């Protein structure tokens, strides 16, 4: 069994000696968590995607009551997204460097690092040789893609669970990061950042920003993009989603990239939306971001001022300037 040599780590993560690893299940105190394909399922049955319920042969009458704040559409969308775009691409490495520019990676060597909302594990993939242990958690079936992408990484523990209901002990992680996740939750994103403090003393969080430092055209286009997102995010048809991501990439993103390339001659490319973020990216990578951008029903944006308001909880706040 994959977790046989990880018993001590699991005891430390859950903060109890009462941990047993049994065939296809993990027992912690009085709680039992199924294990499917090396992924420990922390959620209650009412939060299970259909495929998980079927694998566990659960009947509807045995499922627990609906959980308040549970966003099934977000679970569906991100599970669908990462199964549609499961690959870790070469350009992800450059993105990794941008997201982690505030982190001294050398300091992670003997640390336990937690990736909350890990998706396909694309950031953990570049950390697997830089830390002692990785803990990956996602709310969707993308966690199984992450397991496959890190199949040769024996220092990793995989959980499927709800970020807001973690059964882990306080300060279980030396470093915790959550990239592009909390702004999609149905609860206040900044409050969720505050709630994560108990799990690690050092956090790296990426949230959508309210375009404080962007030119006027960015702010002008955002309301139109939001209207489109609210409409198309309700459509779950896979053919529609595939065609929409292709259309969006070819007829919205790439034209803006081309316009930005032309404006580079005059030093004005920074004023063109999408150019800086997507210039040089592959069509596949752009389509994945179109999916991410337009098929999520919930999108929160925060200002620099509101981020600095987190000083009511944290001793130090550092805001990155690269993204």
Q: Language-model features: where?
A:
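Short catalytic/ligand-binding loop motif for oxyanion handling, primarily in non-cytosolic enzymes
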Residues: 50, 122-124, 185, 211-216
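Amphipathic alpha-helical segments
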Residues: 307-312
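A short SAM/SAH-binding and catalytic strip from SAM-dependent methyltransferases
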Residues: 175-187
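Conserved class I S-adenosyl-L-methionine
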Residues: 202-234, 240-243
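A short glycine-rich, Lys/Arg-flanked "PGG" loop and its adjoining helix->strand segment in the class I
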Residues: 190-202
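Catalytic cores of eukaryotic secretory-pathway lumenal/extracellular enzymes that build
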Residues: 145, 188-193, 208
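Substrate-binding/catalytic lobe of Class I Rossmann-like enzymes that use SAM or dcSAM, i.e.
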Residues: 232-304
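Conserved N-terminal segment of class I S-adenosyl-L-methionine
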Residues: 1-169, 175, 298-300, 306, ...
């Amino acid at each position: 069994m994959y977790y046989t040599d990880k018993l001590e780590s699991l005891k430390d993560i859950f903060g109890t000696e009462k941990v047993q690893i049994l065939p296809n299940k993990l027992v912690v105190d009085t709680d039992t968590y199924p294990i499917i394909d090396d992924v420990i399922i922390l959620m209650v049955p009412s939060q299970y995607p259909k495929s998980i319920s079927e694998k566990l042969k659960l009947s509807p009458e045995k499922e627990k009551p609906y959980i308040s704040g549970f966003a099934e559409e977000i679970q569906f969308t991100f599970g669908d997204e990462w199964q549609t775009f499961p690959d870790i691409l070469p350009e992800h490495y450059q993105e990794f460097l941008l997201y982690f520019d505030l982190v001294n990676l050398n300091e992670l060597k003997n640390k336990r690092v937690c990736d909350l909302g890990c998706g396909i594990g694309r950031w953990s993939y570049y950390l697997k040789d830089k830390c002692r242990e990785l803990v990956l958690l996602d709310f969707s079936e993308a966690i199984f893609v992450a397991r496959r992408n890190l199949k040769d990484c024996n220092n990793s523990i995989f959980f499927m669970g709800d970020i807001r209901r973690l059964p882990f002990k306080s300060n279980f992680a030396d470093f915790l990061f959550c990239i592009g996740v909390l702004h999609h939750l149905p609860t206040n994103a900044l409050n969720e950042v505050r709630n994560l403090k108990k799990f690690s003393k050092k956090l790296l969080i990426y949230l959508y920003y309210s375009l404080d430092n962007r030119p006027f055209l960015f702010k002008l286009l955002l309301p139109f993009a939001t209207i489109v997102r609210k409409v198309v995010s309700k459509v779950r048809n896979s053919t529609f989603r595939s065609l929409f991501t292709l259309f969006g990439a070819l007829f919205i993103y790439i034209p803006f990239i081309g316009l930005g390339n032309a404006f580079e001659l005059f030093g004005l490319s920074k004023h063109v939306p999408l150019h800086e973020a997507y210039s040089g990216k592959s069509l596949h990578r752009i389509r994945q971001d179109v999916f991410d951008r337009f098929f999520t029903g919930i999108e929160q944006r925060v200002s620099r001022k509101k981020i600095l308001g987190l000083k009511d909880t944290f001793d130090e706040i550092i805001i990155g300037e690269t993204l």
